[in-house]
Amino acid sequence: MEIKKNNDYELLIEDLTMSGEGVGRIDGYALFVKDTIPGDRVIAKATKLNKNYGYGRLMSVIEPSKDRVEAKCPVAKACGGCTLMAMSYERQLEFKRHLIENNLIRIGGLSGIEVPPVIGMDNPYRYRNKAQFPVGTDKDGNIVMGFYAGRTHSIIPNEDCLIGSDINAGILAEIKAFMIMNHIKSYDENSHSGLVRHVLIRTGFTTGQIMVCVVINGSSIPKEDELVKKLLALSFSNERKIASIMVNINREKTNVILGKKCRVLYGTPYIEDYIGEVKYRIQPLSFYQVNPVQTEKLYNIALDYAGLTGNETVWDLYCGIGTISLFLAKKAKKVYGVEIVPEAIEDAVTNAKLNGIDNAEFYVGKAEEILPEKYDKENVHADVIVVDPPRKGCDEALLDTMVKMAPERIVYVSCDSATLARDLKFLVGNGYEVKKVQGVDQFCHSGHVETVVLMVNTKEE
């Protein structure tokens, strides 16, 4: 059958992409359809056609999948965030387990590896400790706060995201009322005019400390003291309170949310939080895992896989603000962390001091440059190497150096099981064996899943 653009087709959704689009086939031709899940029988309009695959828009669901549920969020379809919210949570976890397993086999050539069920959450809502709300104006001139629709910069009004903290709505309502009362305009990215661009809210789930950071296209907000008073007058359940109110200055014509300069209006330039027994100091620009409940599970698995006895030297690559490094340092002889972002390393050093940890040392730079240089010039040693790279995975130069260093164990923490599988294939081809694999659901209702892998050196001494 010839597939024609703008024609409607009936198809059975058989699979999902990592981005959460359903995959159906018309005589073998794959059509990706948003807002569908496996088992749905749908009518879809073909909107964009390539040689071997195309995209369709959901017109109607003829017969819903047994795994389809009513999304709790009223804007789930329009918002670009929770692509899997119409799928039962149990099925989401199975989809993610299958995704990991399939990538290991298809990309890594690693068949026969047991992939156990993904570790999910008892309550997969209200789990995010950070939210960034763009601020704009609707067609009627009203201030709107919410999230961008998928692949656009069109704001979907939503001040109470169900995967975010329940404190967000009250804070946003107060800021919006303040803006209206004082005739403060929201930012327009087309004309580069207006003042308020974003509102960033961070919460320490264990400490109850809250940070409110208003991102502005200017140097100050009119009547800042009044805004501070209004925010501090808010009350929150479970003894949570605002510990930091800041402005972040971003005058650039850019899609980057935060500028480099912050100014404190109240409290400290940071909040604090714990993962396990380790305390972390978090600033507006700090990278910090957004799901603290699952992060603790993830790090405990990584720590278990590392098999530390107190005598090991560990290298933690792509260490960020030292979140995993400091977990490891409590059980290791020495930990070296490497991270490309200077500010993150400053946070890592601060966090080490905050916890009285003196056996962690940090380097600024690319992991694929620092580790080979240290190995070639100083012949550094590693009993265990932990890697937690970005989605693109590890550079081959880094993997090559890791193999040369021949640690007993490699613990690979991945946010993309496709690049994970590619890198594991290299390591398996160079003397390492995959011993354990575990998925952890850090981003409930999205297509993303974190995976932890233990590899052991099989080469003879």
Language-model segments: which ranges?
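Short, aliphatic-rich beta-strand segments
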Residues: 201, 208-217, 279-283, 384
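Rossmann-like S-adenosyl-L-methionine
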Residues: 2-7, 18, 222-461
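Extended interfacial segments that mediate partner engagement and assembly in macromolecular machines
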Residues: 59-71, 77-186, 206, 221
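Short, acidic/hydrophobic/Gly-rich beta-strand patch recurrent on exposed beta strands
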Residues: 22-27, 146-149, 213-215, 348
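Conserved loop-to-beta-strand segment in the C-terminal subdomain of adenylate-forming
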Residues: 53, 207-211, 447
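Short, solvent-exposed loop/turn elements at beta->coil junctions and helix N-caps
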Residues: 116-124, 189, 198, 439-442
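Terminal RNA-binding accessory module
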Residues: 1-75, 361, 368-369
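Short edge beta-strands and adjacent turn/loop segments
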Residues: 193-206
